C-alpha cells in the first residue's frame, strides 16, 4: 500500500468559482484521490480557501462586510458547493487559520536565518485618492506583453506573465479607478530566489516524468529575460499573516503582512495540521505526511493546478521549502491544466463570465458535470464548453451507454426471473471473450488513471461500458430466453455482476451514480477487480436486487436552448 499526498490549488475566497476553476484543479485531484483510495492506498487529500490579500479585501468591501466575516461566510459557501460536487477532501481548510499564521511566520524566520531574505526599500504606487499604498493586485492596467487591458499588478491572467505594478501601461487603482498615483518609498522583504536558482533548476531537471506543460512553464520563468528574480513576500495590507520572524517581531515590518502567494502554498501543510486538530490527532499524525525526518520519506506528493499557478509551485514555493533547510516534503509530480473556455469566450471569475459551480448544481446533479468536465479536461490544450457538446456527451455516454445497460438488464431480469440474480446456465465462449476484453481494457484504464491522463481514462472507462453493451446486443438474452431460458439466466447473471463492476470502476468519475448502482444491487463490496472473471461472480445466484430509477436522464433540446440563453456569459 502506497501513501499518497494530494493537494489541489486552493481557490480564492472572492466569490463562487466557475467550472473552469473546478476542472483545472479540484475535480481532477478528487478523481485521482478517489481512484487511489479505491485501489487500497492511504490517501491524504487537502484543499482550502485562499483568504488573504487584495482579492479578499476588495470582495469584502464590495459586499459591505468586514473582511473576516466575509471570508468566514464564503469559506462555508465554497465548502458546501465542494460537497455538492462530491469533492472528497480529507480536510478543507482556511489559509487564515492560526496554524497557517504560525507556519508562515516560521518559514520566514528560517529563511531569514539562512540568509535568503533581504530587506529592500522600494518605490511603490501610492494612491492619493485612496490615501494608501497599493499592493500589486490593487493596481490594474494594460499588460506590456499581450495588451490585455485588465492585467493585475502581479500577473496577467490572459497570458500568465508575472508582472510588477510598474510594468503596467496606464496603471489605475483597483479600489477607486483613480489614475492619480505616486511612487513613494516603502520597505519590504524579498525572498532571494536567485540565490536558490541552481538548486531549483537541478530539482526541476530531475523531474523527467512531469507533463510538458508544467516543465515548459517552469523553465520559461527560470531562463526567459533576466531569469529567476527575487520576489517580494510582504505587502502594505491590513488583512493577512502579520510579518514576524518566527515567533519574534520583525523590526521595521510593523503593520505589514506576508504576500498571499507566500502564505497560500504553506496552507497545504497547515491544512494537514488543521486536519489533525479537527480529528483529535497529534502533531505526529500530520508530520508523517510532510516531514521526511518523521515518516514522510515514503510519501508520493502530487499537486493539481491550472497553468497560471505553475510558476508559484515550481519556483517560489520550492524556494521557500529549500531555503528553510528543514526536511519538508517537496512535490513529486505536478499535474497542470490549460484553460477551459466558455462558449466562444473565456470563463472569468473577475468578469463574471460563464457557468459557476452553484448554478451548475441548480440545474443538474454533480455527476453530469463531473463526467463532461473530466472527459473534456484541458490537458494538452485549451478546451471549450458548449451546451451542444455537453448535451451530446451526457445523452450518449451517460444515458445511452451506461444508463441504458443498467435499465435494460435490471428490468429484463425483473420481468423474466424476478428481482433476484438467476441461477441457471453457465458461461460460454461469448462470456469468456467478454471477460478477456474487459480485463485488457481495465488494464488500459488503470494505466491512464495511474498516469493522471484524465481524458484518456474517461475514454477507456466509456470503452468498458460499451463492451458490456455490445455483449448484450450480440448475446440478446431477450431472444435467447424464448428457446434457452437457462442460458439467458447465465447471461443476465453476468450482466448484473457487470453493473457492480461498472459501479466500482466508475466511482472516481461519477460517485453518486456508482452508489446508486450498488444500492440497487444491495451490495457493499467495493473491492477493486484485480481479476475480472472473479469480479463477475461477486453477486451469487439468489442475491436480491431492486430495479433502480433512471440512472441518467437525457437533456432535451428545449432545456439546452433555455440554459444557453440563461447562462449567456454574465453572472449578475
Swiss-Prot record:
Protein name: Methionine--tRNA ligase
Keyword Ligase attached: yes
Segments traversing the membrane: none
Main function: Is required not only for elongation of protein synthesis but also for the initiation of all mRNA translation through initiator tRNA(fMet) aminoacylation.
Entry-linked SUPFAM superfamilies: Anticodon-binding domain of a subclass of class I aminoacyl-tRNA synthetases (SSF47323), Methionyl-tRNA synthetase (MetRS), Zn-domain (SSF57770), Nucleotidylyl transferase (SSF52374)
Aminoacyl-tRNA synthetase is among the record's keywords: yes
Co-factor requirement: Zn(2+)
Family the UniProt entry places it in: Belongs to the class-I aminoacyl-tRNA synthetase family. MetG type 1 subfamily.
Compartment(s) where it occurs, according to its Swiss-Prot or TrEMBL record: Cytoplasm
Details of cofactor binding: Binds 1 zinc ion per subunit.
Annotated Zn(2+) binding sites: 143, 146, 156, 159
Pfam families listed in its UniProt record: Anticodon_3, tRNA-synt_1g
Gene3D superfamilies: HUPs, Isoleucyl-tRNA Synthetase, Domain 1, Methionyl-tRNA synthetase, Zn-domain
GO biological process: methionyl-tRNA aminoacylation
EC numbers: 6.1.1.10
GO MF term (any one): methionine-tRNA ligase activity
UniProt organism field: Cereibacter sphaeroides (strain ATCC 17023 / DSM 158 / JCM 6121 / CCUG 31486 / LMG 2827 / NBRC 12203 / NCIMB 8253 / ATH 2.4.1.) (Rhodobacter sphaeroides)
PANTHER family on file: METHIONINE--TRNA LIGASE (PTHR45765), METHIONINE--TRNA LIGASE, CYTOPLASMIC (PTHR45765:SF1)
Residues noted as binding ATP in the record, renumbered to the chain: 349
Catalytic activity from the UniProt record: tRNA(Met) + L-methionine + ATP = L-methionyl-tRNA(Met) + AMP + diphosphate
